[in-house]
Amino acid sequence: MSPDRTGRGSSSSSSSLKRLVCKSFVRAWGRRRPNLRRAVLLICTASAIYGIVIASQVLRGSTHPGKALRKAQQKVLTDASVRLAGTALEGNTFYMENAQPQGGSTSSSPVTLQPNVVYITLKTKRSKPANIRGTVRPKKRRKYGARRPGVVQDTESKKDTLWSKVPNSQHKSQAQSWIRGIDGHRGGRGTHQSNIRIYSDSAPPWFTKEDISAMRFLSDSRIGHIKQNLLLFESDQTPLMKMPVPPVGSGDCQGQCGVIKRPLDMSEVFAFHLDRVLGLNRTLPSVSRSLEFVQDGQPCPVILWDPSLLPTDNKTQSSIKLKWGTYQEMLRHKCWLNGKAPKADLGCTEIHHQEWCKMALFDFLLQVYTRLDR
């Protein structure tokens, strides 16, 4: 018997069975019976119909097992394709695997099982960016050291003099720094090029000619001597600006000198530029200069030495010795305000009252809170 005839016979038998059940239900319902018996009969009939429907579905699945499995696999693939919609990228590769039935045995039917496992391999991103055309790379400037006759001999003689003044504990760290640090001139092919460069036609309006000359002196001059705890260097050239004559017997500086301070005092360089921009003109010229024999080559602030200022110690320059109480008294008395001479018993100094306001402005801008605590 062919499968088609078997299917038609099963469908006709199920329809005749349904008709028989319906007729018996109508006959039983038409008879007169108590309400309780009718309710029990109704529940039993519904249960019988439900059992018949379930049995027919099981019979259909057993006669065509491949069709039911195919539908289930198609449903799984449809759900997977919906989830992966929109995630496929250009160049992605998809790999499929065929799944076996739950029993573990492979079906002998000629129908091929549909894949239900999907593997996605995304393309890796490029680690290096593509070369962009049209970019312009800045050219590196080459600096040529100018050698002059007699410089080597002068350098060797000054190196021996300076080496004897440096403590023995620092000889090891400064062995390669003196030859570079003595000659501060830099240039190319016999021409001197200053480290202070102005690329416009004129200097900034807040700098005077004396300021620019002092800055070039501090950045380009050769280091000649190192004295006491202050690191000073003297100029062997013609003085660029007129400086007050140092007091006799001071022994600190003869001529034009500079003070090399710690790298932590770099705020003094910023204070000099801020002083000139604001038009106060109360700070000494200072620059930042790299010296290999100081703090492992870190840039240090170099300040112009003014011999007219009285050094309170060997580390800083200040005009008077001042404490917090004296400072408060001078502010209260308003010494030299509007050109009025103060009384002798007030203890005023030569500093005008307006100068304290400028110092307070500097302390606020530079965030200096320990000026009077030193």
Curated annotation (Swiss-Prot):
Cytoplasmic side stretches: 1-38
Keywords: Glycoprotein, Golgi apparatus, Membrane, Signal-anchor, Transmembrane, Transmembrane helix
Membrane-crossing segments per the record: 39-61
Primary location recorded for the protein, binned into one broad class: Golgi
Record topology, Extracellular segments: 62-374
Biased composition (Polar residues): 166-177
Keyword DNA repair: no
Pfam short name (any one): FAM198
Glycosylation sites: 281, 314
Subcellular location, record wording: Golgi apparatus membrane
GO cellular component annotations of the record: Golgi apparatus; Golgi membrane
Highest rank taxon of the organism: Eukaryota
Record-stated family: Belongs to the GASK family.
PANTHER family in the cross-refs: GOLGI-ASSOCIATED KINASE 1B, GOLGI-ASSOCIATED KINASE 1B-RELATED
Protein name, entry field: Golgi-associated kinase 1B
Organism: Xenopus laevis (African clawed frog)
